[in-house]
Amino acid sequence: MFQRRIHVAINGIPKYKGDSETICKHIIQNCWNGSFFQVSTGHFSLFYIRDFGMCIDALLRLGYQKEAQKTLQFALTVYSRENRITTTISRNGIGFDVFSYAPDSLAFLLYSLRVSKNKELVEMYKPFLELQISHFYNTVVDEKTGLVQSGRNFSSIKDHAKRSVSCYDSCCIAVVAREATMLGLKNPFVNTYSYKKIQEKIKETFWTGDYFSDCEASDIITGDANVFPYWFRIFTDRKMIIKSIAAIQKQKLDQPLPLKYTSFIPKNFFFPLELVAPNYEGNSIWAHLGLCYIDVVASVDKKLARKYVQEYKKQIEKHKNFLELYNPEGQPYKSLFYYSDAGMLWCSKWFVLKTL
């Protein structure tokens, strides 16, 4: 990353020719390396199940069925060989977690298998998947509450932050419980907390009446807590979605473009991040979070969703690339040691959203 920071300082970020559509087409093609879809053409040229899961619907709609299936085959080959599901896999097929076990890894894997209709892969890896669901249940779930275990720092969408019993992680429990059943896999949740019970517990614990709070012991309004309960389709109530959008807008998390995690810079980050990339996951603007937010907005307000899509179009054509994140003012994020990654696979989501 630091090596790339030096390269960007000297040469700038790579620039693609053409309009926003042409740029995104080239990026998606370049993110396919023959074995799997990597997250970016920059320093994150790795496999992340979270990012792939966010993009799989768009990739399928864009005609990348074979590539998506090969990506899942690649991931399951590595996962089953190592007998674990990790956040990340290197280009040479080594799995590792950034920075610890993440509840959303299994959630996005099961989700991806279902939406891609990969019944053969599910059947082939059924014993392994069922073992991992059992491991997830024993590692993540608090049997007294049906939510994530308290006092544990799981890796998450904000992988540099220390959070306990977050709304996002608890939503991942609901996803695993639901997807396991839908895929016909042995499901330990049916004996304790059913999907419906987990759904009810999430609402009881995190829903304030106007928005989802970030964590069990916090009433902070965050972007991820008010996107993924809906993006995962755990909740589809139109009135709830509209209230969460209003809460996001009140905190200006969608300005100058969506979406920020918080309206301020929290203090709950692991120490090294503050030195290398200050405000990396604070009130900086994340494109993947923004695109998932636009997915949710589109379900209730297509006019607003189109406005957000146009804002990203301007950024794509301005930088001739699709960037990872921006500072709070909407400029490419940079620090002494880090510069926003580019050539993000996430642009596949924008490519589909532009047709709204």
Regions found by a protein language model. Give the residues of each.
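Aromatic-rich carbohydrate-recognition surfaces in CAZymes
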Residues: 45-143, 170, 287-293, 297, ...
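Short, solvent-exposed segments of well-ordered alpha helices
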Residues: 39-46, 93-100, 160, 164-167, ...
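Structural helix-adjacent loops and short alpha-helical linkers that scaffold large soluble proteins
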Residues: 11-17, 59-72, 114-130, 181-196, ...
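C-terminal hydrophobic structural anchor segments
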Residues: 283-286, 290-323
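Low-complexity, Ser/Thr/Pro/Gly-enriched N-terminal "stalk/linker" regions
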Residues: 1-47, 69-70, 74, 83-84, ...
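Generic long, charged, amphipathic alpha-helical segments
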Residues: 262-283
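Catalytic cores of carbohydrate-active enzymes
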Residues: 18, 44, 82-88, 144-155, ...
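Active-site acid/base region of carbohydrate-active enzymes
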Residues: 5-23, 62, 80, 113-168, ...
